[in-house]
Amino acid sequence: MSKKFSSKNSQRYVVVHRPHDDPSFYDTDASAHVLVPVSNPNKTSPEADLRKKDVSSTKPKGRRAHVGEAALYGINFDDSEYDYTQHLKPIGLDPENSIFIASKGNEQKVEKKNIEDLFIEPKYRRDEIEKDDALPVFQRGMAKPEYLLHQQDTTDEIRGFKPDMNPALREVLEALEDEAYVVNDDVVVEDISKKTQLQGDNYGEEEKEDDIFAQLLGSGEAKDEDEFEDEFDEWDIDNVENFEDENYVKEMAQFDNIENLEDLENIDYQADVRRFQKDNSILEKHNSDDEFSNAGLDSVNPSEEEDVLGELPSIQDKSKTGKKKRKSRQKKGAMSDVSGFSMSSSAIARTETMTVLDDQYDQIINGYENYEEELEEDEEQNYQPFDMSAERSDFESMLDDFLDNYELESGGRKLAKKDKEIERLKEAADEVSKGKLSQRRNRERQEKKKLEKVTNTLSSLKF
């Protein structure tokens, strides 16, 4: 008879997949699952019993005396099972193997700033409003109309077109944008007659000019028209002959006492140039008026001929060729086409040293001009027209061979040899295509064929 089943002596198994490291994993005849024995969860193993005995033997019999003292030294770990204070030592006993770590104080937490506070004035911030128990200026991320009123340059009451505005207020607003109403604090408008009495004869020309502009800025009508006309007299064209003799005698005498280059540094020749240009502009202004005749300007010519300054060169005609323009510039030297003055200040009287330098410069320039003229003359003399009879006998055949075998590509920038296959493809494409380029190529081919027929017939004739 078989023994009865006993759960105490039974063995429990579970069905699991066969592991990959099993030698029978790749065997097709073996099953994919295996039985693995497991222990009874209700039955304790002898190893577990031994482990419990070891733990129970290590537990202290009494309660620790230092539980809770670690927190006094800044140690926030649970010291119910381990005494962390045994590693602490009094300060000064072993300075080589111990260090002092101070406990952390109560740090103030930094409040997070709101992005809205970066764009709001201090008096409109949230914390200030809460102190004053005022309403917030922002609601749901948008500014209220009360806050936007403070950001406007001009209030809505006077902004835009206001036909019913007070005329006095309108004039004030227009004056704020008009430069004519702007008061210049730097310019003091004073009566010129009172100032001349105080300062006397030492009143400078520059100060007079400032007072003139100050009076103009002050505006208003003139007190006495006759006095105003006498004070600001315009240029008199009738006295132009003797004006330079009366006013510039001392300045003209400076040019007679020049002996070396150092004397030229003390002469303000630029003032003469500015005065010369100013006189010409005044004369041109009077010439443009119809009341002045051309006969009245004849008296100006002698003074211009005796002037130290040279005449302004006439602007060249645009119809000149490039070579003629280049020659004219070389003859002028460093002088410009418009002003006639050079970088070497040719308006100054030339000394002996400067004259020698000018002569040497002219000789060098003339040498270059003669060289260019000789080259042009040689080209004109040695020029011979093309003569086909003087060329070699096979020259024509060489040209024909070159034109038949080579062509220009890339828009005429590249010379390449003709390809018969490409020409054949082009002809086939031109026959099918209806574009303008294809039609033009077809016409050129037809004309070429006609020309070849004519040449063949002429070559076959015997004379």
Swiss-Prot record:
Main location group: nucleus
Residue numbers of N-acetylserine PTMs: S2
Cellular localization per UniProt: Nucleus; Cytoplasm
Modified residue annotations for Phosphoserine: S288, S293, S299, S303
Motif range (Nuclear export signal): 168-179
GO CC entries: cytoplasm; cytosol; late endosome; late endosome membrane; nucleolus; nucleus; preribosome, small subunit precursor; Ragulator complex
Stretches assigned to coiled coil: 355-462
Name this polypeptide is given: Protein LTV1
Gene: LTV1
